[in-house]
Amino acid sequence: MVDVGGVAGQTNSSATLTACYATGNVIIEMAPNKNIAGGGLVGMNAGSSLLACYATGNVTSTGSSTGYVHIGGFLGNNYTTVTACYWKNNHEQGIGYNKKSTEATKVDGTNVTWQKAVDAMNTALQNAGSEWRYELKGALPTLRKQ
């Protein structure tokens, strides 16, 4: 198994990743006989709920594999809850393989802007003690302690 992500390759506990983000590119070097899970934020999300997070780095791969290959702009594989999470990168699909009915949303600049994403993330973060701010048009959201 090869799990690659901008914040974590794999999550396994029953924790919650809250208000996190990744902006770096993720490059997946495929192993010929391995299963592959790669995403802009997390490769294999097996146990952590995700709340108000985003990813913007491009996700690319080199090589090939005879195993399964699940790559998404936000998550490679997902087995838990995703709430108010967003991505903006080279992928049309946010989650490569999704066992839950929740989904991340793509910021396309037209239907979904960063301001709309920040508003939704802040609604989800009402009791978390932090808030996202979108102050400069064209820039990325920043996190601020309340």
Please report, for each region that a protein language model flagged, where it lies by residue.
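Predominantly extracellular beta-rich ligand-binding scaffolds that present long acidic/polar faces
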Residues: 1-146
